[in-house]
């Protein structure tokens, strides 16, 4: 991330500096502003037939690419609560996360600003009332501002993961980890 500030927000000095890739510091008044990592969540929702549910992104970054259901963690919200909320908002589905799978750093570029994130991924098995993922998808209501549609992909090999047009490298790494532990 480069320094986007031209003036110190506290004293107005033009001497504000970007330090060590972590914070802005004004040597004139001592103001410092840390650029902390944002927390984001995603879920690998799978069925008994090695099918995984993906969303098709409706907006940048990476509009039109596949992603795992999820999003940013809100202030004062746990990662577990965030993934349940995101599934409800984006898909109209009540999903209970099964277990924590992994986390990976990610870079999220939005409106030409680079945000560093820590993406936390969970797994959940398809709710028992559905015979398979296609049956489940028929019940979903997409959040139009976030999701163009849903895709079900068979994921049982590294080659199948490599062939996916994924929006984010953290999802790619997560699916490889999912294959290792399932």
Walk through the language-model features, giving the residues of each.
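Charged phosphate-binding loop/patch that engages nucleotide di/tri-phosphates or the phosphate backbone
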Residues: 167-182
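Conserved Nudix-box catalytic region and its N-terminal flanking loop in Nudix hydrolases
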Residues: 47-89
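Residue-level preference for beta-strand/loop junctions
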Residues: 37, 64, 114-118
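Acidic, metal-coordinating catalytic segment for phosphate/diphosphate chemistry
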Residues: 1-43, 48
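Active-site donor-binding loop signature of nucleotide-sugar glycosyltransferases
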Residues: 28, 57, 70, 152-157
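Conserved hydrophobic "DFG−1" position in protein kinase catalytic cores
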Residues: 45-46, 54, 124, 152
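Beta-strand scaffold of nucleotide-dependent catalytic cores
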Residues: 42, 53-56, 138-139
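Unchanged
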Residues: 73-99, 104-167
